[in-house]
């Protein structure tokens, strides 16, 4: 289900004024980019720009063609009196692969090796351009799955989940391993950590996730899969469903106790003695379609 805009809710200098077509195209483009997955009625545009529907339709056709050509996204048209246009962020396959290849090369760095078979990712996940690419890739793959919320576990997965949620224009929820008094009442579950085989706890505020939600799980790293299994169990406790699970990086040298997930980068070899690490592209590019 899409959000909708009947009346433009952000005032800018020049609102409801007659603009030149070039100015109108720029302003319209920005409004679409600012409101992904949101139905904007043609009446909103005709009122805002004091232009005929035929002129607005021509403008939208120009933007639609350019967005698709440049790999920005697609514009869907909803017919009828209550119809309008919806901007859906998408990425071209070649753009996604090029971004992932750059990340893969940065992952092939032995200095990223941490004790216990973990990989240092914090520097990458602090870069806005990396988050932009990851967020758009994942959101593009799930744009037609009617996602209601993006879920991650504190703390390293938060930047990716927030970026994905921004592109999908849905809330993101943070699962914690220890409760905060500011969260109010919570729902908690026990799960088996795949990496340590210990029973651990995760919890989520009752007010965070409405019953019946379709949830996309996003995380930074997968070693054995216990965390993803735990989040799936927690989603069930909210009478909701898991639409999918995506991780930025997975360790292919560990035994996984989880299925039905995709990864953007996969570590296929770790040798702490010789300080060697090998990364390849994950199955994300096999299991998902792009623009």
What spans do the regions from the language model cover?
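Extreme N-terminal segment that seeds HTH/winged-HTH DNA-binding domains in transcriptional regulators
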Residues: 2-41
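The alpha-helix within a helix-turn-helix
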Residues: 45-46
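The short coil/loop that forms the "turn" connecting the two helices of the helix-turn-helix
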Residues: 50-51, 170
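Key DNA-contact positions within bacterial/archaeal DNA-binding proteins
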Residues: 53-55
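Residue-level detection of the helix-turn-helix DNA-binding "recognition helix"
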Residues: 57-68
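Active-site-facing substrate-recognition patch
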Residues: 82, 86-146
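Short, glycine/charge-rich flexible loops or terminal/linker lids adjacent to PRPP-binding catalytic cores
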Residues: 170-215
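PRPP-dependent phosphoribosyltransferase catalytic core
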Residues: 233-291
């Amino acid at each position: 289900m899409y959000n909708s805009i009947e009346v433009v809710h952000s005032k800018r200098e020049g609102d409801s004024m007659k603009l030149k077509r070039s100015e109108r195209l720029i302003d319209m483009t920005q409004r679409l980019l600012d409101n992904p997955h949101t139905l904007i009625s043609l009446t909103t545009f005709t009122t805002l720009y004091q232009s005929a529907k035929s002129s607005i339709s021509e403008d939208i056709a120009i933007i639609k063609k350019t967005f698709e050509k440049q790999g920005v996204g697609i514009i869907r048209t909803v017919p009828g009196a209550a119809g309008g246009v919806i901007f859906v962020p998408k990425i071209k396959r070649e753009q996604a692969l090029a971004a992932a290849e750059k990340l893969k090369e940065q992952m092939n760095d032995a200095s990223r090796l941490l004790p216990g078979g973990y990989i240092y990712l914090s520097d990458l996940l602090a870069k806005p351009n990396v988050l932009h690419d990851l967020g758009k890739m994942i959101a593009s793959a799930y744009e037609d799955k009617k996602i209601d919320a993006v879920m991650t576990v504190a703390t390293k997965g938060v930047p990716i989940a927030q970026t994905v949620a921004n592109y999908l224009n849905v809330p993101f929820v943070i699962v914690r391993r220890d409760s905060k008094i500011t969260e109010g009442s919570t729902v908690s579950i026990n799960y088996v950590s795949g990496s340590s085989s210990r029973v651990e706890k995760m919890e989520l505020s009752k007010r965070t996730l409405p019953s019946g939600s379709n949830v996309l799980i996003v995380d930074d790293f997968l070693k054995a899969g216990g965390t993803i299994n735990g989040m799936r169990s927690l989603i069930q406790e909210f009478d909701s469903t898991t639409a999918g699970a995506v991780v930025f990086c997975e360790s292919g040298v560990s035994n996984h106790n989880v299925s039905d997930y995709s990864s953007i980068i996969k570590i296929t070899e770790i040798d702490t003695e010789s300080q060697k690490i090998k990364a390849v592209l994950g199955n994300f590019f096999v299991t998902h379609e792009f623009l």
